[in-house]
Amino acid sequence: MTYSFGKELGYVRGMRRILPALAITLLPLLAAAQGTAENQQATFRSGVDLVTVSATVRDGKGRLVKDLEKKDFEVIDRGERRIINEFRSERAPLSLAILFDVSGSMDTADRATAAKFAAHHLINQLEEGRDEAGLFAFDSRLREVAPFSVDTRALKGALGEVDPFGATSLHDAISAAAERVAARPMARRAVVVLTDGIDTASRLTPAQVSAKAAAIDVPVYIIAVVLPIDDPGSDRATPGATRTAPASIGTIEDLARWTGGALYYSSTSASAYQAARAVVDELRHLYLIAFEPGAAPGWHPIEIRTSQKDFVVRTRGGYVAGPAGR
């Protein structure tokens, strides 16, 4: 893979929806995941435990909307409007679990080097001494390359320890990384995955992983390391090809969307930089919204709306109410 400056980021727009029936089948997994993280999440407290969701808002041109207030939002829970008990929009420290795919497929077309390039840009976007990141690698298992740290120089130095080898347990690794970052004290937390999207060895499906990450309100961002011909946003994409993701990327795009995250492409040095910047910028401008959970136990699909009808809000798909859920 040859990297040259001047190419634009291919950003995938539009929200894919997972059928409500899927959420019902995943209730045990959701409840277990939320029970694990219940005491770890940076949540609001107001007499009772509140459901906390993070949301990003974009206007009709895809630009982040950064100046909304509590009165501009409404929460719809199972078709009913909920009162917003707490609201935050101020800038806050970030905590990122940066997850490298080091499977054998990443050793072709220089994808591993491209992933390190994108990670370097991610770390450059962090504020020294304020934001933190941890580096993790996976093939058939998850491995900690560097613990969570605010020392960006140390994090960059650890990138040299990432080398491709083995099978791919992508979905399992995302699940494990989400649990790691959910334990961090920062309110703005996310998993950023650098991968070609090929999974050969996971036990968990993308739907199961997205349900687990959504349950603990950890958005998953995918930076797909692909060739320019496979990048829907590249002017070197295959002529006549539809502007859709390659087959190996489609399922993890759903995974990212369901958690409130997003999919970006990295096929050139410029698009790697743009993807890293877009992820961090979005996380810095999350709105944190808290409300009392519904009384009925089980899965609660939620929708966050704004008073501006042309604004698009992205957030997790719902939560589980009951003793184990939040």
Spans of model-derived segments:
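Bacterial N-terminal signal peptides
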Residues: 20-31
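Scaffold/interface architecture of coatomer-like assemblies
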Residues: 33-326
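Positively charged n-region of N-terminal signal peptides that target proteins for export
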Residues: 13-18
